[in-house]
């Protein structure tokens, strides 16, 4: 897939999944704008890939509107938006989760995604073309002890469908990717601190492994590309088979690899 001549904006683009998307789009010819709350990190990545950096807190609607206007004025109309900005949540019992914790997750993961999609997507719709890929999560598809994060990501999936319907005849496609347990720096830190058990995460997936940021980026690029020109409003899980494997635990778990059977 070539993205030569395309302008791509990545929110939360300086680390994790966002950084993988930024690098991969740049490698395939796109002019990439790395936006992030951490401007220094965004500038370092932009310098590495030959892109542009911009400070952006997606939780503020006006900041997204200003970023969309500034990028268009400096570089031209945006062709691709990837909304990867997000914050995580520790698994806590509902009564231990503070109102401030919930508000921050909702502000960034749900409202922030909405702010960016509308700020850039409305301009795409007026121009008659564009592709948006939102980053949701399998946490928005199943019950988990993530009482703020899971509902916020479920909302991202549904807003993706709503925007796809509204902008479809204006030439704008909107799709979601739902990552499974992805070996980002944040998850790697949690594993190193003993907060997550990598064996449990791997064994819960049909493929027996975790997902990489590059796995997610490949799916994002496909949905953003012309190869997906007839695809809009979908949610694509990229989870190494976690969703399909969960119910097998009630039947004794997944079978071993065929090569290990007698």
Which residues does each predicted region cover?
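Residue(s) in the substrate-gating loop at a strand-loop-helix junction
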Residues: 137
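Canonical Rossmann dinucleotide-binding motif of NAD(H)/NADP(H)-dependent dehydrogenases/reductases
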Residues: 2-33
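Alpha-helical segment proximal to the catalytic Tyr-Lys
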Residues: 122, 165-169, 229
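Substrate-binding pocket helix/loop in short-chain dehydrogenase/reductase
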Residues: 92-94, 98-106, 201
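Active-site helix of classical SDR
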Residues: 117, 152, 160
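Active-site loop-to-helix junction immediately N-terminal to the catalytic Tyr of the SDR YXXXK motif
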Residues: 97, 142-151, 162, 190
């Amino acid at each position: 897939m070539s993205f030569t001549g395309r302008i791509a904006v990545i929110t939360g683009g300086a680390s994790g999944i966002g950084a993988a998307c930024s690098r991969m789009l740049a490698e395939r010819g796109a002019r990439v704008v790395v936006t992030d709350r951490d401007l220094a990190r965004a500038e370092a990545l932009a310098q590495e890939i030959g892109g542009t950096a911009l400070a952006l807190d997606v939780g503020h609607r006006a900041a997204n509107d200003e970023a969309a206007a500034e990028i268009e004025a400096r570089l031209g109309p945006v062709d691709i938006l990837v909304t990867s900005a997000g914050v995580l949540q520790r698994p806590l019992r509902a009564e231990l989760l503070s109102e401030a914790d919930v508000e921050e997750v909702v502000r960034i993961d749900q409202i922030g995604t909405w702010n960016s999609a509308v700020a850039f997507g409305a301009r795409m719709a007026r121009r008659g073309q564009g592709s948006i890929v939102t980053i949701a999560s399998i946490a928005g598809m199943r019950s988990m002890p993530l009482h703020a994060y899971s509902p916020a990501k479920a909302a991202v999936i549904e807003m993706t469908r709503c925007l796809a319907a509204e902008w479809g005849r204006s030439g704008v496609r909107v799709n979601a990717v739902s990552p499974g347990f992805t070996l980002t720096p944040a998850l790697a830190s949690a594993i190193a601190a003993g907060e997550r058990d990598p064996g449990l995460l791997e064994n819960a997936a049909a493929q027996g492994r975790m997902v990489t940021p590059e796995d997610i980026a490949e799916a994002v690029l496909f949905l953003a590309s012309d190869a997906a020109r007839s695809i809009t409003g979908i949610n694509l899980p990229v989870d190494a088979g976690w969703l399909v494997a969960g119910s097998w635990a009630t039947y004794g778990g997944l079978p071993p690899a065929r090569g290990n059977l007698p």
